[in-house]
Amino acid sequence: MKYLAAVGIALASLSAAAHAQSRTVFDVMESRGDLLGWEAVGRLDMPHGFCTGALVGRDLVLTAAHCVFDPDTGQPYAARGMTFRAGYHHGGSITERPVARWAVPDRYAAGMAEAGSMTSGEAVATDVALLRLAQPVSSAEADPFRVHETPSPGTRVSVVSYGRGREEVLSREPDCEVTQRYRHDVLGFDCDVTFGSSGAPVFVRENDRLRILSVISSGNARGEAYGPSLPALVSELRQRLNREDARPKVTTGARRIT
């Protein structure tokens, strides 16, 4: 496996990738009917911008870890300041939910606490966040996607996202592929990405069903994108959120003993 020596993560590199966008033909979902089958992909709105996210459970949204940190200060966003808007389209959405809490890998959180930013290949490998919604999304509104195991280079993939210049509509880049698997389980793709594409699901088709292979972490001006391998990280974060939910609620007059 090759070592990803210096991948510029998050918004810094995605700004450069915006120049490559003009080379790519996106399937822009201009009408509500175009969203059929993609209802579980949505826009994650935060105090200072937005990312793309996707449901992987009735009350779980998958996105990139750097989306839940302020890019200027490196401080984590409060969950109450985030809203997931499934199937967002020109100001409306199929449904929307506030975020109740979120979790990122310990290694990513430690790096942000120490340096205020993450710019290494290892950072891309842990650039995953799982968000617990305040209320679940019903099956009548959107069906969550499942996470796929890591494929081999050459596997065809597609990226579904919001982005700069297409903030109000969901778009799909239908024709890119896995180009490389690097050290730390970082995956490379020949997909063009830009601001807002952070956290966008990278889809692979398995037995005629779409599965999420990765999420967009970063990209460059050459039309290359990078993202982490998901299964182990998503499992870890899901378990952590479940443990937190199982803790006794602290009420007035009571004190939690840890």
Task: Give the ranges of each region predicted by the language model.
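Active-site substrate-binding loop(s) of clan PA
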Residues: A54, P71-T73, A109-E122, A129-G165
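Conserved catalytic-core segment of clan PA serine endopeptidases
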Residues: Q21-L36, F50, Q75-V137
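Extracellular/periplasmic catalytic domains that process cell-envelope and extracellular macromolecules
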Residues: D34-G37, P47, L55-V56, Q75-A78, ...
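Catalytic nucleophile loop of clan PA
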Residues: A54-L55, D192-I216
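Catalytic histidine site
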Residues: G37-T83
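Protease-domain processing segments flanking chymotrypsin-fold serine proteases, especially trypsin-like
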Residues: Y3-A12, A16-V56, D106, S171-P174, ...
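Short beta->alpha transition motifs characteristic of CBS
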Residues: A64-C67, L213-R222
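Short conserved beta-strand and strand-loop elements enriched in small hydrophobics
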Residues: G42-L44, A79-H89, T155-S161
